[in-house]
Regions:
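Short gly/pro/ser/thr-enriched loop/turn and capping motifs at secondary-structure boundaries
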Residues: 16, 163-167, 187-192, 219-221
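NAD(P)-dependent Rossmann-like dehydrogenase/reductase catalytic/cofactor-binding core
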Residues: 306-364
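Rossmann-fold dehydrogenase core element
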Residues: 173-186, 207, 211
Length: 364
């Protein structure tokens, strides 16, 4: 089987965990259960078939360096799980647009190199799948790269909360071009949103009325520092909120995107946490006899490795769709792997739909 030729835009902690993760599991036995992956062999593709052939960034400490070096450079501070040999993939100067917010601009030095022609670079590298890891709030930049993917006939995996796959206009653009997209906003393996979503549904399934809830997140990576700029947070808060409330069938919070009784979002930046994230979640409800029933928990994770396996699955799903000539949103992959897919499903149903897609039993 041929490799999946992958390009990355945004060589931050998530890209670091992705590149390290492919190296870490490249020799995994196909019958092994790997934490964070649906399958070692996802359809025709093994983890080792993911091959990085291009990368784009705007950080002067990354542009011009081999991807294997850039993933450990500048402000990247995630846990190291694997050495990565030289890849022969220099990080190219990407397009900035709105990709650098206030805190990014104060922290890193923007490369003075000329931005490359992204479409031509994707074509030259014969890229199959482009993964967008741009900072939260990069609305213009993310849509720019999405258009580049369409123009270069490259499948697009949208890991950030900019609504592209879930926007009917953009979905039609991808479908008309025959280019697959998996988006929007990557889920973690076991993160704050997925645990919150499951427990909110558990309340409902057990007949408890969920009246109010919050999810407060703190971390020490550049993602959290960037999100101190509250103007960049609107889509992030919406994505996390609707991921939780869309899993409720009825009750006062069902389907709510904005409500005083639901608060879900990043809260603060704590530098010494590095790439760790701490989530504080509380659910308040009413049980039999209108008696209060409250649940509170704290989740501690390394943020970036927590989604790396999910991205590997998303990349392989996008490539399968490309192989089959399917354009537009890949609904089964999106509903299981993303927080804000075009169509929300309960998680067990989403996984079953994706398994059926892998087997070729449903189109998308």
């Amino acid at each position: 089987m041929t490799s999946i030729r992958v390009a990355i835009v945004g060589v931050g902690n998530c890209a670091s965990s992705l590149v390290q993760g492919v190296q870490y599991y490249k020799d995994a036995d196909v019958d092994t259960k790997v934490p964070g992956l649906m399958h070692v062999q996802f359809g025709p593709y093994h983890v080792r078939d993911v091959e990085f052939v291009a990368a784009f960034d705007v950080d002067a400490k990354k542009v011009g360096f081999d991807l294997s070096e850039a993933i450990f450079a500048s402000e990247n501070n995630t846990i190291k799980i694997s050495d990565v040999p030289p890849l022969g993939v220099p990080v190219q100067r990407g397009v900035t647009n709105d990709g650098l917010g206030k805190y990014y601009s104060e922290t890193i030095e923007e490369s003075d190199a000329e931005p490359v022609d992204i479409v031509q670079a994707l074509k030259d590298a014969k890229v199959d799948v482009l993964v967008s890891y741009l900072p939260v709030g990069s609305e213009i930049a993310d849509k720019y790269y999405a258009q580049c993917a369409i123009d270069a006939n490259v499948a697009f995996v949208n890991a950030l909360p900019v609504f592209i796959a879930s926007d009917p206009e953009w979905a039609k653009k991808f479908e008309d071009a025959g280019v697959p997209i998996v988006g929007d906003d990557i889920k973690s393996q076991v993160g704050a949103t997925i645990t919150h979503r499951v427990l909110a549904r558990l309340f409902e399934d057990r007949g408890v009325i969920l009246d109010r809830t919050y999810q407060l997140n703190v971390g020490g990576n550049m993602d959290f520092k960037n999100m101190l700029e509250r103007e960049r947070l609107q889509s992030k808060k919406l994505s996390k909120t609707q991921s939780v409330t869309s899993n409720l069938n009825d009750g006062p919070l069902s389907g709510k995107k904005e409500d005083r009784n639901v608060h879900i979002g990043p809260s603060d930046y704590v530098a010494w946490l590095d790439d760790r994230k701490w989530a504080y979640v509380r659910l308040e409800g009413r049980a039999f006899g209108e008696v209060p029933l409250n649940l509170e928990y704290k989740l501690e994770v390394w943020d970036s490795p927590n989604s790396a396996g999910i991205i590997i699955d998303a990349i392989r799903a996008a490539k399968i769709a490309k192989d089959r000539g399917i354009g537009g949103p890949i609904l089964s992959a999106a509903t299981y792997l993303m927080k804000s897919p075009p169509v929300q499903m309960e998680d067990t149903a989403g996984r079953a739909a994706l398994e059926a897609f892998i087997r070729g039993e449903n189109e998308r």
